[in-house]
């Protein structure tokens, strides 16, 4: 789940955001490459259309409908989908609490040395629980401007709650040919996901904390990340997401709808839905 949200919510970072398509209105279509630990880059696509958004990978699509205040996570392999709503946030938090409680029960019967080792690993990976308030997000300049693809960008370290979470290279919207209005769906999706991941405590993705107004104030210009590098834990794993192109075109018919024949699943099946191929 963390890996999925690193792209879907953080991009996550750090990856880190669509009316039903087919109309005459052109949507903003962004193509990205995502490289996991130096492996061959995999294509990712994001479609933005007013208050709607669709993010696609080879295995999973995430659709945000601002008009319905819902997110659908679609899995083409088995034609299933998970629906996230504001009302489902409490269910997520309850399941997370239940899972943590079960883990603590299992740890209690282990030898002390082994238990402490596992607890330390869990603390490093998950943190110590949900803070009372969202963590503070800061942008720290991380070197001179550089070129990523066709764009000049300024590198910043994103610091969440006093800890470095990811590095982004941010290009000016004017250079990208984008406007804030075109990013409305992305901003609304980020706000929705921030509420959802807050229910998960320390598993929240730092990229869902991005607020365009706050970011503009912090860095001094309206911008958008053209490259995001997110590191996970102390294991050295990192995911690099790079913007490759921006186009305007009509979205495919039904781009923001649940495809016919898909079956809704519950939260007990969420791990299977979000598991990588």
Where are each of the predicted segments found?
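Bacterial N-terminal signal peptides
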Residues: 9-20
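Bacterial N-terminal signal peptides that target proteins for export
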Residues: 1-11
């Amino acid at each position: 789940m963390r890996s999925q949200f690193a792209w879907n919510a953080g991009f996550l970072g750090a990856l880190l955001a669509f009316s039903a398509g087919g109309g005459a209105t052109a949507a903003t279509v962004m193509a990205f490459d995502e490289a996991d630990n130096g492996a061959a880059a995999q294509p990712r696509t994001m479609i933005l259309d007013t208050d709607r958004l669709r993010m696609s990978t080879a295995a999973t699509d995430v659709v945000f409908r601002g008009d319905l205040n819902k997110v659908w996570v679609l899995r083409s392999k088995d034609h299933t989908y998970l629906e996230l709503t504001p009302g489902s946030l409490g269910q997520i938090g309850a399941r997370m609490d239940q899972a943590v409680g079960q883990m603590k029960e299992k740890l209690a019967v282990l030898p002390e040395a082994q238990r402490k080792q596992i607890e330390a690993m869990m603390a490093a990976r998950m943190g110590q629980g949900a803070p009372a308030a969202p963590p503070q997000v800061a942008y720290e300049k991380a070197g001179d401007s550089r070129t990523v693809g066709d764009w000049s960008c300024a590198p910043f370290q994103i610091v969440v709650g006093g800890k470095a979470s990811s590095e982004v290279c941010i290009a000016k919207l004017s250079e990208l040919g984008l406007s804030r209005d075109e990013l409305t769906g992305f901003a609304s999706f980020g706000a929705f996901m921030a509420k959802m991941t807050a229910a998960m405590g320390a598993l929240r993705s730092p990229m869902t904390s991005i607020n365009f107004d706050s970011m503009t104030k912090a860095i001094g210009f309206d911008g958008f990340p053209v490259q995001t590098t997110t590191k996970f834990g102390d294991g050295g794993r990192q995911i690099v997401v790079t913007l490759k192109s921006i186009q305007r075109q009509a979205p495919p018919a039904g781009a923001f709808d649940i495809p016919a024949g898909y079956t809704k699943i519950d939260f007990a099946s969420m791990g299977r839905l979000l598991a990588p191929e």
